[in-house]
Amino acid sequence: MFDGIMPLIGSLLLVICVMVGVAFLTLLERKVLGYIQIRKGPNKVGFNGLLQPFSDAVKLFTKEQTYPLLSNYISYYFSPVFSLFLSLLIWMCIPYLIKLYSFNLGVLFFLCCTSLGVYTVMIAGWSSNSNYALLGGLRAVAQTISYEVSLALILLSFIFLVGNYNFLSFYFYQDYVWFIFFCFPLGLVWLASCLAETNRTPFDFAEGESELVSGFNVEYSSGGFALIFLAEYSSILFMSMLFVVIFLGSDIYSFMFFLKLSFISFIFIWVRGTLPRFRYDKLMYLAWKSFLPLSLNYLFFFVGLKIFFISLLF
């Protein structure tokens, strides 16, 4: 009984903490963008604007839920819910030492969840029955699939080195030296791929205001929009955490881990405040002509390195 209840309580606490983290990430983003644009940002609600995200949530969920006449009702309503469910499910592969869930195949679980995330975007765009939403959805799907290839290859090259699919072994492996020191180009590729994967500036083509209004979520209002928004920011937070686990290997219980996590999240926001939007064809060229060859080369290098070390031992 106790063994059955503890993982449930642990996962519930995790979901609550992620939601609170996402709320304050939006506040951090608005504050940082405010200071980048030489203004204050939110500072009225609560002490220095601390309660702003909660008032935003109340405002969004109390608004009227519109229903486009031509939309496919069930898929239109369930795609944001499924999107949020997937982005919260990915958090289960965090390398916890406590008795939550033991994931020996955490890397594969992460790749499966991110691949499934494509369908929610596609269905959200298609079920709205709006041309703009469909175009935004198609762009987002093409972009996500393109950058998932380089993400998977980078992870595969590290798996060859670490020899395990568990994220916990990444932390044990980097006791003496971080991966970022001898794989710096790979770290930059991973960061750029994360930006593309989460549809962030400079790769936010699903939301090109000048052409597609707001992208695949253009027909969503109040609750549906809030769920898509939560899913996006939850995946940003998770990608930042994954960058820290893979490249800046630190103990998940140390204060330094959360300091690094905050810094990587800040980089996501900083990039949004400073870089203009990329061109769509250049985005695709970047994925297939630059990132793919680089990650493949690193993969071959790591395989060769592993074979070399094994041949030295035996």
UniProtKB/Swiss-Prot annotation:
One of its GO terms (cellular component) is mitochondrial inner membrane. It comes from the Eukaryota. It is a multi-pass membrane protein. The chain crosses the membrane at residues 5-25, 78-98, 105-125, 152-172, 176-196, 227-247, 251-271, 294-314. Its EC number is 7.1.1.2. InterPro entries: NADH_UbQ_OxRdtase_su1/FPO (IPR001694), NADH_UbQ_OxRdtase_su1_CS (IPR018086). Keywords: Electron transport, Membrane, Mitochondrion, Mitochondrion inner membrane, NAD, Respiratory chain, Translocase, Transmembrane, Transmembrane helix, Transport, Ubiquinone. One of its GO terms (biological process) is aerobic respiration. It is an enzyme of class 7 (translocase). GO terms for molecular function: NADH dehydrogenase (ubiquinone) activity. PROSITE patterns: COMPLEX1_ND1_1, COMPLEX1_ND1_2. It is found in: Mitochondrion inner membrane. It catalyses: a ubiquinone + NADH + 5 H(+)(in) = a ubiquinol + NAD(+) + 4 H(+)(out). Core subunit of the mitochondrial membrane respiratory chain NADH dehydrogenase (Complex I) that is believed to belong to the minimal assembly required for catalysis. Complex I functions in the transfer of electrons from NADH to the respiratory chain. The immediate electron acceptor for the enzyme is believed to be ubiquinone. Belongs to the complex I subunit 1 family. HAMAP family: NDH1_NuoH. This is NADH-ubiquinone oxidoreductase chain 1. The lineage of its organism: Eukaryota, Metazoa, Ecdysozoa, Arthropoda, Hexapoda.
